[in-house]
Amino acid sequence: MFGLGKKKKPEDPNSNEALEGESNRSNSVNDAAIQDESSLFARLKNGLSRTRSRLSDGLAEIVLGEKTIDLDLLEEIETQLLSADIGIDATDQIIDNLKKQLRRKQLADPKQFMTALRQELTDILEPVDVPLIIQSEPKPFVILMVGVNGVGKTTSIGKLAKLYQSQGLNVMLAAGDTFRAAAVEQLQEWGARNSVPVVAQATGADSASVIFDAYQSAKAKNVDVLIADTAGRLHTKDNLMNELEKIVRVLKKQDERLPDEVLLVLDATTGQNALNQAESFNKTTTLSGLALTKLDGTAKGGVVFALAKKLSLPIRFIGVGEKIDDLKPFKAKDYVDALFSE
């Protein structure tokens, strides 16, 4: 009787029910994040299956059947690493460090040896595990994409645009590969698919002029990220490499900091030749990062270690499939784990 007409007391935010509800919401978010990470790793693992078959499966065949670890075994390991495109410099470092551990009797059995080997591989990659951070100011953040024909440069631009869009950034593309009409059309197709504006001129136009126009447009429209394509050039052709220098000069006249990133796209299927390309490009223009494509189609994914050891350039992205979201930010530990995952 006396309770009629009284308002119900608001729920105490500190009550057990309120706390339980908040906890459930938090757990749902955490579970979704864990599931997403698990999915990403599964795709990375699947994309690296051919390299894993050559590298880790081959190593396991050599090591796991042995009762003792000795110098003769290390010679077999050295041969296996070289055949997996790890490269001479990286392989020498790995073997030298394993020999030191062997002398200190720290590699008593195959399991310890494989753990030590994985750590050596991770140690080579960790210094180049440097993500590309898009600075919010000044705008636009300019990424200049370079590389030889056929490495997947234009496709990588489309995938990068989608990645940055998913992060809530405004993106514009510059069709700076004016030598091939197909390249301009391909970039415009990527732009249309993702609703990203593309600045382009006629085939044969001056590439530096196209990128200059794109920069001016992006700046006026307050665009967050401008990704500029360039002509696929042979690293042995001086005239094309000189054109790349011109593009950089034109950008620096607008702002000395530009370009913010010079990203070299390399095809993993070329193995050690990718290293030669990177060295040549780095002489012409100062590279700030690498993107390694087509890892899903090759057993030569060991070249990542060769690049890391020889050049010490950040590996920004790796391509592990043909889907639009198969260009992934590079993570050293995940890469090694995927190579040795069963």
Roles of regions detected by a PLM:
Residues T122-E342:
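P-loop/Walker A NTP-binding module and the surrounding RecA-like catalytic core of P-loop NTPases
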Residues M1-D123, P127-V130, P138-K139, S166:
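Non-catalytic terminal/linker segments enriched in charged/polar, low-complexity residues
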